C-alpha cells in the first residue's frame, strides 16, 4: 500500500497531478480542488495517499491535509459513496464544514455538492452521526482543549462546535471563559 509520495509536479490539472519521484518514477494522483489550489507545476511536494485497487484499475488519491484524507477515507466506506463522489465532497467542503454538516444534520450542505441528492445526503448524515468526526483534529490545540473542557462541564458538543468558530480568544482558559458567556 502506498501511503505517501514525494516528488516534483510535472503535470497539473484541476483535479489531477503527476508527481515524478527522485527515482524517476511518475505517479498520477487524483486530488481535490482545495489541494489543487495550493500546488504549482514544478513544485516539490509530499502528498499523503490513499490507494484504491479495483479489478480494472489501481488508483491513487493525494492529500496535503491529513484531515481531508481522513474525510475521504471515511466517505468511501459508506454504502453508495465511491471514490469519485468522495472526492467531489472533498472538493466542495472543508473537513470542518463537513464535520459541522454531519453534527448539525445539515443535508442542504451535502446537496450543494454536485452529484449528491437528498437521499445520499441523508444517508451520509445517518451513517456518520455516531462516527468520531474530523473537527476535533482540524482545530488548533487550544480550541480542541476548550471543546473537551466544555464537554466535561456538561455542554453538548453540537452547541460548542456551533459557537467555537465565532470566538476570538487564543488561549484555552480565555476561550472557555468566552464560550461559557455564550453558552449560558
From Swiss-Prot:
GO terms for biological process: DNA recombination; DNA repair. Residues 1-64 are annotated as: Domain I. GO terms for cellular component: cytoplasm; Holliday junction helicase complex; Holliday junction resolvase complex. Residues 144 are annotated as: Flexible linker. Transmembrane segments: none annotated. InterPro entries: DNA_helicase_Holl-junc_RuvA_I, Hlx-hairpin-Hlx_DNA-bd_motif, NA-bd_OB-fold, RuvA, RuvA_2-like, RuvA_C, RuvA_C_sf. Residues 65-144 are annotated as: Domain II. The keyword Cytoplasm applies. Coiled coil: none annotated. Residues 144-184 are annotated as: Domain III. GO terms for molecular function: ATP binding; four-way junction DNA binding; four-way junction helicase activity. The keyword DNA damage applies. Pfam families: HHH_5, RuvA_C, RuvA_N. HAMAP family: DNA_HJ_migration_RuvA. Has three domains with a flexible linker between the domains II and III and assumes an 'L' shape. Domain III is highly mobile and contacts RuvB. Homotetramer. Forms an RuvA(8)-RuvB(12)-Holliday junction (HJ) complex. HJ DNA is sandwiched between 2 RuvA tetramers; dsDNA enters through RuvA and exits via RuvB. An RuvB hexamer assembles on each DNA strand where it exits the tetramer. Each RuvB hexamer is contacted by two RuvA subunits (via domain III) on 2 adjacent RuvB subunits; this complex drives branch migration. In the full resolvosome a probable DNA-RuvA(4)-RuvB(12)-RuvC(2) complex forms which resolves the HJ. Belongs to the RuvA family. This is Holliday junction branch migration complex subunit RuvA. It comes from Campylobacter curvus (strain 525.92). The gene is ruvA.
Amino acid at each position: 500500500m502506498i501511503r505517501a509520495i514525494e516528488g516534483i509536479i510535472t503535470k497539473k490539472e484541476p483535479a489531477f497531478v503527476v508527481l515524478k519521484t527522485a527515482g524517476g518514477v511518475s505517479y498520477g494522483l487524483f486530488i481535490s480542488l482545495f489541494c489543487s489550489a495550493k500546488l504549482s507545476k514544478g513544485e516539490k511536494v509530499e502528498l499523503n495517499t490513499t490507494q484504491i485497487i479495483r479489478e480494472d484499475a489501481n488508483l491513487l488519491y493525494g492529500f496535503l491535509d491529513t484531515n481531508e484524507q481522513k474525510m475521504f477515507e471515511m466517505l468511501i466506506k459508506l454504502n453508495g459513496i465511491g471514490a469519485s463522489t468522495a472526492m467531489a465532497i472533498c472538493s466542495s467542503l472543508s473537513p470542518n464544514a463537513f464535520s459541522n454538516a454531519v453534527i448539525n444534520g445539515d443535508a442542504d450542505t451535502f446537496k450543494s455538492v454536485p452529484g449528491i441528492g437528498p437521499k445520499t445526503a441523508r444517508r451520509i448524515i445517518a451513517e456518520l452521526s455516531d462516527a468520531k468526526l474530523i473537527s476535533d483534529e482540524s482545530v488548533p490545540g487550544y480550541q480542541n482543549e476548550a471543546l473537551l473542557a466544555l464537554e466535561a462541564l456538561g455542554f453538548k458538543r453540537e452547541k460548542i462546535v456551533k459557537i467555537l468558530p465565532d470566538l476570538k480568544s487564543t488561549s484555552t482558559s480565555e476561550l472557555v471563559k468566552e464560550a461559557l458567556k455564550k453558552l449560558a
